[in-house]
Amino acid sequence: MTAQQAQRFPGTGLQWSLGLIALILAACLISDGLSGGPQLSLPLLLAGALSWLVCWIGVPRLRALKMGQVIRQEGPQSHQSKSGTPTMGGLLLVPCGVVVGSLVSPGDPRLLPIGLVTLAFMVIGGIDDWRSLTKRHNTGLTPKGKLLLQALAAGLFLLWAGLHGAIPTAIALPWGWLLPIGLLIWPLGLFVFLAESNATNLTDGLDGLAAGVGAIVLVGLSLQLMLRGNGGDPALAGYGAALAGAWLGFLLHNRHPARVFMGDTGSLAMGAALSAIALLSNSLWPLLLMGGLLLAESLSVILQVWVFKATKGADGQGKRLLRMAPLHHHFELGGWSERRVVVSFWGISLLLVALGLVLVP
């Protein structure tokens, strides 16, 4: 495919973003109609409007503070034109989702720790972004340093969950099956936080990609929580919808061509929020399935490195499984336009969510 052909992908970034928002809102309204109240649509709309407004006010401020993204030289050369686009947009959107989500069921004790761990990962990502900006190079915290801080925040959340009996000891699977894991939930929970937050971080490489995929998965988790027996779990479902709304409001500023990037500030917080909601609601299986695209992005990096090292010769050169990792760059270098990659990945995530809803535990 030539560059000219790649640009023929129909529609604009705004049109596709509005279409995704309309589709997600319709799904929430259908769920609300079945449950008898605006348990998903209201927090989705409130957080979305608040996030859009805060970003509309805050993005020019980020630009004035010269908080422009430093683009790594190893990435696609077409991305060099994005250099200088304001980053750390997570500072604007994440608090919007947390605040609105906390108002869904103020008396539910689970919402505060979810909000705190989400904000903690936002701060970790913010430190990473800030160090990258001050050094004027796309490297912030050391990988070990970042992982240690993430593990500390996740560990404190898991400790709270364990002390309050809020952490499952058996994983709910489709068709009523349960997988007893006992104390293994502790290392598994830690792994979920680290893997999910870094998966969302890797996915945040194209305009609107992570924001759209993250919102889709968050709403998917919320919908399956409402479909469960005994009235579902409206508190966590509404919280997830609020967070999804915050990322959708941000998406209107982050869609191609992006006015702002969420940075690690937003992507790490997204992974933490997904992990916390999934763990407290025993939705690890739905998260694995619905977030399959996030998993694919992570695996693409792992496999790329493994193949290169396994085939590396004396000259230091090895073979590559993909043109470039993560996976979205592989399609970019294959001639796909950025918008085509993003919309296609959104579509895959929507299909995975639909499959996950069929297989609700």
From Swiss-Prot:
Source domain of life: Bacteria
Keywords: Cell cycle, Cell division, Cell inner membrane, Cell membrane, Cell shape, Cell wall biogenesis/degradation, Magnesium, Membrane, Metal-binding, Peptidoglycan synthesis, Transferase, Transmembrane, Transmembrane helix
Keyword hit for Chaperone: no
GO biological process: cell division; cell wall organization; peptidoglycan biosynthetic process; regulation of cell shape
GO cellular component: plasma membrane
Cofactor(s) it depends on: Mg(2+)
Pathway(s) this gene product operates in, as recorded in its UniProt entry: Cell wall biogenesis; peptidoglycan biosynthesis
Parts of the chain that traverse the membrane: 10-30, 40-60, 84-104, 107-127, 147-167, 175-195, 206-226, 232-252, 260-280, 288-308, 341-361
Catalyzed reactions: UDP-N-acetyl-alpha-D-muramoyl-L-alanyl-gamma-D-glutamyl-meso-2,6-diaminopimeloyl-D-alanyl-D-alanine + di-trans,octa-cis-undecaprenyl phosphate = di-trans,octa-cis-undecaprenyl diphospho-N-acetyl-alpha-D-muramoyl-L-alanyl-D-glutamyl-meso-2,6-diaminopimeloyl-D-alanyl-D-alanine + UMP
Subcellular location: Cell inner membrane
Keyword Cell membrane on entry: yes
Membrane topology classification: Multi-pass membrane protein
EC numbers, comma separated: 2.7.8.13
GO molecular function, a single term: UDP-N-acetylmuramoyl-L-alanyl-D-glutamyl-meso-2,6-diaminopimelyl-D-alanyl-D-alanine:undecaprenyl-phosphate transferase activity
Protein's job: Catalyzes the initial step of the lipid cycle reactions in the biosynthesis of the cell wall peptidoglycan: transfers peptidoglycan precursor phospho-MurNAc-pentapeptide from UDP-MurNAc-pentapeptide onto the lipid carrier undecaprenyl phosphate, yielding undecaprenyl-pyrophosphoryl-MurNAc-pentapeptide, known as lipid I.
NCBIfam families: mraY (TIGR00445)
Family to which the UniProt record says this protein belongs: Belongs to the glycosyltransferase 4 family. MraY subfamily.
PANTHER family from the UniProt entry: PHOSPHO-N-ACETYLMURAMOYL-PENTAPEPTIDE-TRANSFERASE, PHOSPHO-N-ACETYLMURAMOYL-PENTAPEPTIDE-TRANSFERASE HOMOLOG
Protein name: Phospho-N-acetylmuramoyl-pentapeptide-transferase
Organism of this sequence: Synechococcus sp. (strain RCC307)
